[in-house]
C-alpha cells in the first residue's frame, strides 16, 4: 500500500510541474498557477445494501474528513483538482433493541474536473465532478444489544473489501482568493462486500460532505 501512495503522490507532483510549465507558455492558461490547500469538514454517510434482491439504505452517520488538495490549471476557467483525504464514512442500522454502527476509515484521492467562475475579485464559484479512489485503513463494526457491546474490524477477512471507487460531485466558493466553503457527494460504485458462495450481497458507500478550507 505504501508503494501505491508513493506512486500516486509522485504522479500528482509530476502533473503539477507539467501544468506549471504549460501555464507559463500559453495565454489561454489560468494565470494563478498551481495552488495547494487544506480542507476539513463533516460527512453525513450511509451504506447502500442489497441482500436477497432487496435494496435498502442504512440510517445516516455523522463523521468527518481532513485532507490536502492541489489545483492544477488547464485552461482559462478549467482546472484539475486532486488531493489526499482521510475520510470517515459508514452508517447505522437498528432493529428493536439491536443497533449496529459501521465506521470505516479511508484514504481517498479524488481526481476532479473543476470549472471556475469569478464574481469579480471577491469570490470564485467552482463546480467539480470526477472519480474518486479510496483504500480502507481501519474502522469498526460495533454491535449493541441489551446493554452489551461487541465490536470487530470493519475490514475483517469475511466482511468488506478495502478498495473503493466511485464518482464525486460538488460545488464550492472561494472567498478573497483563499477561504473555501464547499459541498460534495460521494457516490460509491464499487461493491465492497466480500461475497462467498452464492451470496448476492452488495455494499456501496454514500456520503454527503461539507468542507471548510484555506488555499495558499
Which positions does each model-derived feature cover?
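Outer-membrane beta-barrel channels and translocator barrels
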Residues: 31, 75, 87, 118-122, ...
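Residues that define the transmembrane beta-barrel architecture of outer-membrane proteins
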Residues: 32-34, 60-64, 103-109, 123, ...
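Flexible, solvent-exposed loop segments that connect beta-strands
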Residues: 46-58, 88-105, 137-162, 191-203, ...
Amino acid at each position: 500500500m505504501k508503494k501505491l501512495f508513493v506512486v500516486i503522490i509522485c504522479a500528482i507532483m509530476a502533473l503539477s510541474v507539467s501544468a506549471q510549465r504549460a501555464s507559463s507558455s500559453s495565454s489561454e492558461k489560468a494565470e494563478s498557477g498551481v495552488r495547494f490547500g487544506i480542507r476539513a469538514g463533516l460527512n453525513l454517510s450511509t451504506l447502500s445494501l442489497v441482500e436477497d434482491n432487496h435494496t435498502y439504505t442504512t440510517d445516516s452517520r455523522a463523521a468527518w474528513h481532513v485532507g490536502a488538495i492541489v489545483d492544477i490549471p488547464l485552461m482559462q476557467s478549467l482546472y484539475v483538482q486532486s488531493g489526499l483525504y482521510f475520510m470517515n464514512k459508514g452508517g447505522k442500522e437498528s432493529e428493536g433493541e439491536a443497533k449496529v454502527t459501521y465506521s470505516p476509515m479511508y484514504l481517498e484521492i479524488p481526481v476532479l474536473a473543476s470549472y471556475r467562475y469569478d464574481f469579480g475579485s471577491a469570490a470564485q464559484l467552482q463546480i467539480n465532478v470526477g472519480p474518486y479512489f479510496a483504500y480502507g485503513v481501519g474502522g469498526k463494526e460495533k454491535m449493541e444489544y441489551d446493554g452489551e457491546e461487541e465490536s470487530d474490524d470493519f475490514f475483517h477477512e469475511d466482511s468488506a473489501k478495502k478498495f473503493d471507487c466511485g464518482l464525486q460531485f460538488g460545488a464550492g466558493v472561494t472567498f478573497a482568493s483563499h477561504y473555501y466553503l464547499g459541498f460534495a457527494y460521494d457516490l460509491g460504485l464499487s461493491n465492497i462486500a466480500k461475497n462467498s458462495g452464492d451470496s448476492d450481497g452488495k455494499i456501496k458507500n454514500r456520503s454527503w460532505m461539507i468542507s471548510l478550507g484555506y488555499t495558499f
